[in-house]
From Swiss-Prot:
PANTHER family: PROTEIN FAM222A-RELATED, PROTEIN FAM222B. It comes from the Eukaryota. InterPro entries: FAM222 (IPR029340). This is Protein FAM222B. Belongs to the FAM222 family. One of its GO terms (cellular component) is nucleoplasm. Residues 155-167, 183-201 have a biased composition (Low complexity). The gene is FAM222B.
Amino acid sequence: MLACLPGPGDLSFQLLSHTQMNTGLQKWDTTQKMRTAHYPTPAELDAYAKKVANNPLTIKIFPNSVKVPQRKHVRRTVNGLDTSAQRYSPYPTQAATKAGLLAIVKVPAKSILKDFDGTRARLLPEAIMNPPVAPYATVAPSTLAHPQAQALARQQALQHAQTLAHAPPQTLQHPQGIPPPQALSHPQSLQQPQGLGHPQPMAQTQGLVHPQALAHQGLQHPHNPLLHGGRKMPDSDAPPNVTVSTSTIPLSMAATLQHSQPPDLSSIVHQINQFCQTRAGISTTSVCEGQIANPSPISRSLLINASTRVSTHSVPTPMPSCVVNPMEHTHAATAALPAAGPVNLPTGISRVPTGYPSDLKPVTWNQHQLAHLQQMCSEASGTPAPGLTGKHAAGRELAGPGFVGKAPAYPQELCLAQSFHLKPPLEKPTPSPPVNGMAAPLAYPNGHYFQPLWNNILPTPNSDSSGSQDLAMPFHGGQPTGAPLDCAAAPGAHYRAGTGGGPVASQNSLMQTVDYLSGDFQQACFREQSLAMLSKAHRAPGNRAPDPTESRSLHIQHPGYR
């Protein structure tokens, strides 16, 4: 379409205006000038835009006299559309040129015209100019499920978990035997993705019944939907992108906890402690080892205290129960624990000293430790020193999937070589007093860990200062254990040949062990020690750090932390 519009001025009008310049412009001159400068109406512009949108090739002449609705025309409408903004204007903006411009425009399918000055204008077709009054089309299903479907799924998951829990656990047998691997998929281990404000690490565990009663007894307590929401699922049904975090509580404690009210952590730990005290005479000392893994970062210190008080029975001993029933620790049933934190607390190893429980009285605590230590010393005295090789082999077999790295070749570490992941805790743990011969616990960015043994070996007259001293001094429950508690063995039997500082360092660790028992320990296993060495242990409570002049005390470190 060839549109020819009048130019900037008409020759006759110019001549006429010049001849009558002195007399002024007449009325007909003004009307003639207004007719010459043609301003198209919005209807004409709209029709022109529709015609241009339908033609694939259009020849347009843009004179400078063509006026289109600009952005400054507030609330100006064309066919009910607001043309105050450039987005809604169906007309291209014109540049103020002195002469007309001939342009060949190829209209695209999307009806967007690119002007000669670089601007773009969207030509709205009839379907867009007259929008339908029908409601919006249905949006594609999003990733967020509907609330009704979510509630239904939660209710179904809760009913499924309850039916699984009310079914009698046929895989539970006597704890002295080896439970089959199906016991690991028992619904005692239920995932709880959302973190709770208060810790509920042992919501279905720690019953105070005899282990033999579990063979014919199912879990009768109902689940509390307020504690676990509706998102519980067995760990066998967990999706691959969800990490199911569990804690290993033995089967002998997993039955009848009162669920009339939400159980408090301190009351649960107190019941476990009483149960451990009742079973103090039985050699299965690992029953009371509260192996709590992956504590919640909200209450990590509470869980550390809980694991400390759970392992109240843990005494410096080579753990004879691990040799008798080594598979009992591996196939122990899993219990519910909030899976919110990336911190892996070493199971059975607490960084809070067990000499200071928060809820228990120190007198009963010391008596309990005294009874255990005397009993375990009597057991250890009947075992000759060459018999440690059998325990050595059993300790190597124990290093299964639960342990990271190779199993250290130490006879005392059958139960103590626990997993230790170097993940930074979200909250600093409580530093332990230097009961293991260190000057102070070192505050690393990822926790109070101990320095490697080979970084701080001091050259002493009795050592070769080559870094080959592997002192078998495990750190269990906040108290150093080692060779002095084996009464029948030689003082340096557990140290490598060629290290001369072994017996002296073990005596120093022994003194601190006696000091940590608050002086109430009966010196039954230490008759060969002199009274002068024992007098070093009775120091003031605030003066428990070893002497800085005792350089050999810096060697005693836990080899499982290296």
